[in-house]
């Protein structure tokens, strides 16, 4: 099927493009970019006047819960949520049941996504077998099977020697290590950020030092082994300072943050709202300011959701008992566009952090609109206003702290391999 996207503001940082152009798609690939592009007869046309056209957005950190926890989410519902949020590709974390530490699980995910998914799914394998932090997974097998990275997300590797070896082996295999940087001995029984609000609410806190200490360890190990390292969901000003300094020294470290870390503070926990409970926890206003500064100065390379669906029975509990995590695929774009309105980022820089950089970090052939590239394209309506409504979310789970928010900006069309998979 051929497709012509006409008259949109095309933003493609991979080519330094930011101008009104047409895009012709043929046989699932970008054929031509230009003004007044002529299309063959019978070509479907999208009028993108007043809209923004970008390389397909990539969320490099989601939990699809499939296999094993399909009552929370599965590949079908999760990829529908991704498409509705403007994402053409997602990278899914390995904390499934069974854990994705082998070829069989990876192959299952890829096959199901190809057969039933709405968007591209790139599996992330586990660093250690069963994510138990004891024995390294067969990283070569995982990469050959289709994994684009390895991570023990949600279960940080506490053994420093093991983490060192993981970085060394991953470097040799040419696969990225994604670190969930938290010192679990400092996290303890904490359920929110340690500070004034936790004291006021009588909830046990998690100190910023838990993230900072683990970030420092992993950055130094990456420096020692001269290995690439990606730090997931950065939330503290201290960890950002560590990463910024490491980059200045030439350490091969990249990092991401999530929209909730620049949109909310730990004040959101007041009222004991379990939809404001996640890991790492929401931090202070100073941390939010630091996250925005790090997005602006390039310390933070990518925006990823850490989409973590949970059934209502796992969230509608006392705060201490509720599970960590929130859904984010369908609110990420609109929350991130607020950074442009606030003057934190320009649109091209935002696209870089939501499409181009995730592709580079994961080493996948996406994140560009160059002729010949796969036609994964996001068309954004920056003026669309809507309310975050649980009943309208495509995700099976509704655990979002943004329910009821009046927001601006949304995906108008999501195009995967030249096929429209979502239309607003």
UniProtKB/Swiss-Prot annotation:
One biological process term in Gene Ontology: purine nucleobase catabolic process
GO molecular function list: allantoinase activity; dihydroorotase activity; zinc ion binding
InterPro entries: Amidohydro-rel, DHOase, DHOase/Allantoinase_Hydrolase, Dihydroorotase_CS, Metal-dep_hydrolase_composite, Metal_Hydrolase
Entry EC number(s): 3.5.2.3
Metabolic or biological pathway: Pyrimidine metabolism; UMP biosynthesis via de novo pathway; (S)-dihydroorotate from bicarbonate: step 3/3
GO annotations of cellular component type: cytoplasm
Keywords from the UniProt entry: Hydrolase, Metal-binding, Pyrimidine biosynthesis, Zinc
PROSITE patterns: DIHYDROOROTASE_1, DIHYDROOROTASE_2
Catalysed reactions, semicolon-separated: (S)-dihydroorotate + H2O = N-carbamoyl-L-aspartate + H(+)
UniProt family annotation: Belongs to the metallo-dependent hydrolases superfamily. DHOase family. Class I DHOase subfamily.
Name of protein: Dihydroorotase
The organism's taxonomic lineage, starting at the top: Bacteria, Pseudomonadati, Thermodesulfobacteriota, Desulfuromonadia, Geobacterales
Gene: pyrC
């Amino acid at each position: 099927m051929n497709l012509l996207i006409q008259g949109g503001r095309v933003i493609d940082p991979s080519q330094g493009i930011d101008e009104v152009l047409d895009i012709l798609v043929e046989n699932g690939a970008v054929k031509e970019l230009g003004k007044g592009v002529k299309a063959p007869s019978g070509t479907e046309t999208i009028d993108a006047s007043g809209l923004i056209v970008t390389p397909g957005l990539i969320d490099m950190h989601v939990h699809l819960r499939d296999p094993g926890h399909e009552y929370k989410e599965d590949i079908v519902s999760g990829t529908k949520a991704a498409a509705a949020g403007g994402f053409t590709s997602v990278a899914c974390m390995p904390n499934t049941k069974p854990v994705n530490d082998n070829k069989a699980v990876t192959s299952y995910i890829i096959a199901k996504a190809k057969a039933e998914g709405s968007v591209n799914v790139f599996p992330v394998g586990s660093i250690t077998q069963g994510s138990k932090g004891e024995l390294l997974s067969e990283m070569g097998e995982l990469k050959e099977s289709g994994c684009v990275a390895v991570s023990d997300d949600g279960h940080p590797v506490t053994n420093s020697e093991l983490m060192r070896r993981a970085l060394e082996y991953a470097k040799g295999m040419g696969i990225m290590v994604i670190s969930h940087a938290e010192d679990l001995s400092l996290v303890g029984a904490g359920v929110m950020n340690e500070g004034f609000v936790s004291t006021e609410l009588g909830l046990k806190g998690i100190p910023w030092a838990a993230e900072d200490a683990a970030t420092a360890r992993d950055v130094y190990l990456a420096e020692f082994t001269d290995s690439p390292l990606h730090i997931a969901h950065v939330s503290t000003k201290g960890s950002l300072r560590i990463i910024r300094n490491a980059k200045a020294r030439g350490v091969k470290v990249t990092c991401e943050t999530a929209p909730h870390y620049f949109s909310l503070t730990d004040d959101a926990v007041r009222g004991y709202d379990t939809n404001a409970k996640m890991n790492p926890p929401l931090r202070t206003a100073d941390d939010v300011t630091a996250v925005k500064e790090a997005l602006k100065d390039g310390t933070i390379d990518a925006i990823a959701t850490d989409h973590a669906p949970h059934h209502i029975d796992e969230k509608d509990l006392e705060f201490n008992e509720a599970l960590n995590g929130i859904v984010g695929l369908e609110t990420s774009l609109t929350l991130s566009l607020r950074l442009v309105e606030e003057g934190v980022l320009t649109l091209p820089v935002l696209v870089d952090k939501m499409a181009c950089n995730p592709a580079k970090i994961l080493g996948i052939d996406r994140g560009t609109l160059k002729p010949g590239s796969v036609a994964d394209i996001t068309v954004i309506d920056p003026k669309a206003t809507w309310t975050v409504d649980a009943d309208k979310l495509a995700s099976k789970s509704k655990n979002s702290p943004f329910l009821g928010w009046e927001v601006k900006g949304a995906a108008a069309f999501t195009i995967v391999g030249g096929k429209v998979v979502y239309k607003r």
